[in-house]
Amino acid sequence: MSNSTPMSSQGATTRTVTPTSQGGSRTMEVRPQPVLRLSAPSGVLRLRAEPTERRRIQWAEDVVDNEGMGKKSSKVCCIYHKPRAADESSDDESSGSSSDSDSDSEVDNSTARPSSGAGGHRGRAHKHDHGDCEHGHNHGEGSGKPQKRRQRRKPSPNAYEKMPKVKK
């Protein structure tokens, strides 16, 4: 038989009396560890963010939201060409560069050009009616001196291959 009786007025001390096989009894006393309680008020923890002086992206005034979603992006996913006035030049820089230049630094003004296969017959013989002009030369019908061919220039990179200009 087991008998449990609280014995102390101070807490939950428990005494257990257990009969043994020899006719006696065993008494076991269990005392819980005291809990230390502070009566001081608990502190307040205040979390503060880091100063906002870190580097952050600031878009220039002329950056365009080219996807129409209210976001500005540095990724080239849509090619946007800023509208220009009719009398404004289509070159980004001054007209100092020649279109015949073989230079890699040529300004790509992103205008459509005919490919060399279809319609790119610049400098070749042409046929149309000049009437009887009677001025002693042919109009490119193929007879006479062969015309001097221009040397092909390197193709300029497209908008996806070209690095954006950095304004200082």
UniProtKB/Swiss-Prot annotation:
Q: Indicate where this protein is primarily found.
A: nucleus
Keyword Nucleus tagged: yes
- The protein's role, per its UniProt record: Regulator of type 1 phosphatases which maintains protein phosphatase activity under strict control.
Intrachain S-S bonds: none
Task: Write down any Gene Ontology CC term.
Answer: nucleus
Region span, Disordered: 1-168
- Identify the keywords attached in UniProt to this record, alphabetized: Nucleus
Which species expresses this protein natively? Phaeosphaeria nodorum (strain SN15 / ATCC MYA-4574 / FGSC 10173)
- Where are stretches of biased composition, namely Polar residues? 1-25
Protein name as annotated = Type 1 phosphatases regulator YPI1
Q: Where is the composition biased (Basic residues)?
A: 146-155
InterPro entries for the chain: PPI_Ypi1
Q: Which PANTHER family match?
A: E3 UBIQUITIN-PROTEIN LIGASE PPP1R11 (PTHR20835:SF0), E3 UBIQUITIN-PROTEIN LIGASE PPP1R11-RELATED (PTHR20835)
One Pfam family, please name it: PPI_Ypi1
Q: Where is the composition biased (Basic and acidic residues)?
A: 47-59, 129-142
- Give the Gene Ontology MF terms in alphabetical order: protein phosphatase 1 binding; protein serine/threonine phosphatase inhibitor activity
User: Does the keyword field hold Nucleus?
Assistant: yes
The family assignment reads:
Belongs to the YPI1 family.
Give the lineage: Eukaryota, Fungi, Dikarya, Ascomycota, Pezizomycotina
Query: Where is this chain's protein located in or outside the cell?
Result: Nucleus
